[in-house]
Amino acid sequence: MSYNNRSGGGASGGYSRRGYHGSHRGGYRTGRSKYPEDRYLVGGMLSLNKGSHYESSDNRYIPNEIGSKSPENRSHRSSTKDGRTPSGLSTPLSSSDKVSTPISIESINGSDRNTGVNNKDSEFPKLSHHSDFTSTIPFSRSINPQKNFMVINDSHTPKTDKGIQSKKIRYNGEGVNHVSDPRIAQSNSNLQKPTKKTKKTPYKQLPQPKFVYNSDSLGPAPMSTIIIWDLPISTSEPFLRNFVSRYGNPLEEMTFITDPTTAVPLGIVTFKFQGNPQKASELAKNFIKTVRQDELKIDGATLKIALNDNENQLLNRKLESAKKKMLQQRLQREQEEEKRRQKLVEEQKKQELLKKKEKEHQESVKKEKSVEHESTIVSTRDKNLVYKPNSTVLSMRHNHKIISSVILPKDLEKYIKSRPYILIRDKYVPTKKISSHDIKRALKKYDWTRVLSDKSGFFIVFNSLNECERCFLNEDNKKFFEYKLVMEMAIPEGFTNNIRENESKSTNDVLDEATNILIKEFQTFLAKDIRERIIAPNILDLLAHDKYPELVEELKSREQAAKPKVLVTNNQLKENALSILEKQRQLFQQRLPSFRMSHDRTQQHKPKRRNSIIPMQHALNFDDDEDSESHSQSESEDEDEDETTASRPLTPVVSTMKRERSSTITSIEDDIELEEREIKKQKVKVPAIEAEIAPESSPEEGEEEEKEEVEIKQEAEEVDIKFQPTEESPRTVYPEIPFSGDFDLNALQHTIKDSEDLLLAQEVLSETTPSGLSNIEYWSWKSKNRKDVQEISQEEEYIEELPESLQSTTGSFKSEGVRKIPEIEKIGYLPHRKRTNKPIKTIQYEDEDEEKPNENTNAVQSSRVNRANNRRFAADITAQIGSESDVLSLNALTKRKKPVTFARSAIHNWGLYAMEPIAAKEMIIEYVGERIRQQVAEHREKSYLKTGIGSSYLFRIDDNTVIDATKKGGIARFINHCCSPSCTAKIIKVEGKKRIVIYALRDIEANEELTYDYKFERETNDEERIRCLCGAPGCKGYLN
């Protein structure tokens, strides 16, 4: 809006409202006046008539003469803070604030410069916003041309003056000074020297403006990210972070860049300081400046550092260069490795050629020897059976058929080394379910050397063919857990069975061991003699006192000077007197006849005689009797131990387990060896006095005893081993073959072992009439082939008939639909559920009398060791359970638990098993779970049933507390129910809290399943009763 005075037309002294044009930058466009000389522009915002002013008398607007100078106008200040009128426009500024200057306006083509009227405006249609409607709008009040202003507020007058509110405020601009720039006065004062009145220092120049980057700023942010490249690979992130932060500025982020494919560090790091972008940029520049000035180094390498641009161009260049370096280094390594490989390949080829030549030479030598040696091996059990190298004897199912081939993986050739072995295939005893330790435990009564496990099966390796054949004949087709040990005995190609050679080797080995022991003893005695008889006298001669008389005198004088003067006291005199009396008493006892018991008693209470002090150089010439005796005893014991340990691999310890055939010779020899060892130990423990009293045996008696032993051995060797008497109950020479139904030709050949059997068969068949067969050999061959054709395959032999309840009535189970099989019926056909009338343990034996190993295997231990073990066991039991209170510490509870594990159970799902033997009344494990209230337990039990989670593991402590181990618990929750359990549960207090602990009721073997009686209440509804599957002899049939 602009105020215009139109003297030419309309109401004189009035004002007209006209529209304004323009934007914020151009300001408001002033209204056009017909009188160009009466127009005065102020700041391009408001137009007033040039030369006009207000009079204070009548408030009239009177224009001055044309061409006169504009007076010094002064306007009243608006009540608003920015000096605007209520209409929104700025009021005229006073001359003291700003000097108004006219603005030049360029004329538009066709328009009058003075009037601003264009003749061509009539050609265009006039729009509504271009027309002036002020003359048509009626005024809301009467127009007073004398008063064309309104004062709202005057900031110069104080507000405390109450009388000024009634006065009329009017300001005509009296006493106005000339216009001056206030900045010049301020700059002059700052540029001059400081006066005494102020302490302000002058500015050397005007302060420069600073532009802080924020979220509203345009353009890129200042660079604040620092890049370090070519760093050593050994530098870590904490080290570099500490190195940078010690300059006083904390870091915001630091990233180590690695190769995305290989994850190898590229030696490039980017980091940034904390703070706003402006501050971070300044800190980064200062840090780069200090690094370049001081030439800082890390691990001997100078830091290469620079600021990263906003587009990451520098970072990308450094990444590309680092990747190129990595590729070059990798190529160099590959080239070097290829060179090394080529060298290794060449060396290997040379070695292979040499090895081939050596092998060819050895094979040629072996072939020459094998031609001379017999290629057949006669069985030690049956002389009719002849084994050849590179042959396999099949199981009893195939009537011990011999095949001319051996199954031996290449990986196991270096372990077997052409020794006989027994193969148990994986389809009969799976290697994934049964470990080699179980096989070792089952065959521990045989002298095997190794048990190897492979994907094809188990390989039991033997050193002797006799032991391998004995194990094969005794253990073939025996039951092992729920499987059968179907064995195949294999004899490799390079095996030679020379019994005499083996015996000679064993005797030679014994002789070699004896000679080695003797040589070691001779060496020790020789070293002792050299030390005592040669070295010691020469050293004593060199250190003789005669050669150093001056030193001896000096030492004596020093010793005498150093000795303090001894003052004899009354106590010392008493002790001396007592010592004299004691010596007399001892002399009197020595004169009496020495009895053995009295001598022993006095010897026990006799004080030890103090050895005389001898210089070190003379001590080598003397031997202490007591030391020699103790040394001899310890040496003899060590020798006995060495003999036993040395002879262990050659002569194994006699096992107390039962065997099918045990010879009297081996048992007698073993007894003699045990008696000799006991006599040796007794001789060692006898004191020296008893050894002197004991009569020595004459050499003639010893020779007679040796002759008798030799004669006994010769007589025993003449008798065949098979027909010698046994120490156990009488049994057959050959193992009995079970009757398999049809007695065919194979069974007849297998039963007739020797000439005696043949004579008995002839007597039995003497009354039968001979058949009229022309060719018996052809008939026997045909009958054997017919038997092989009719034989059922090995897989079908394991298929058993299902019970009637599980048989299909329609002929196909698919047509019957889905039905739930009860747990009791699953026992009939599931392998891990076959537990009918079996004890609850994992290691089971088919025949308790024959197969179960002797439980008295520890009988070889001395009685002293057994008594000590029993005392220790009783002390542990009394310490744990007998005198145990219900209050324990948490450490004691955790330390006393036994090692247990969980596995598939034959009772139900998972079960808890002991990993080592556990004695009765010992603590086993704590029942761990979430401790909840009774109401929560009832709610959870219902929710578990709804969700179909199956088993819930809730164990009640008391009426208010329940342990829930369903989702938060230990492995103790897997313990199954049994009507005759092996464990029980006790509730004890640990650090003020009740806990459930499981104890052993009886002795538990290793790998035995732990069971517990759930003690559920009897259910009245028979449909809700749960079937018990423990299989114990006294099973109740139901859990509840």
Curated annotation (Swiss-Prot):
Region (Disordered), start-end ranges: 1-129, 175-202, 353-374, 591-664, 692-737
Residues of the Post-SET domain: 1024-1040
Q: Which domain of life is it from?
A: Eukaryota
* InterPro entries linked to this entry: COMPASS_Set1_N-SET (IPR024657), Nucleotide-bd_a/b_plait_sf (IPR012677), Post-SET_dom (IPR003616), RBD_domain_sf (IPR035979), Set1-like (IPR044570), Set1_fungi (IPR017111), SET_assoc (IPR024636), SET_dom (IPR001214)
Which residues are in the SET domain? 898-1015
Enumerate composition-biased segments (Polar residues): 97-119
Q: Where is the composition biased (Acidic residues)?
A: 635-644, 698-709
Keywords on this record? Answer: Chromatin regulator, Chromosome, Methyltransferase, Nucleus, S-adenosyl-L-methionine, Transferase
Q: List the ranges annotated as motif RxxxRR motif.
A: 867-872
Binding partners and assembly:
Component of the Set1C/COMPASS complex.
Describe the family membership recorded for this protein in Swiss-Prot or TrEMBL.
Belongs to the class V-like SAM-binding methyltransferase superfamily.
Q: What is this protein called?
A: Histone-lysine N-methyltransferase, H3 lysine-4 specific
Supply the source organism for this entry. Candida albicans (strain SC5314 / ATCC MYA-2876)
The coding gene here is: SET1
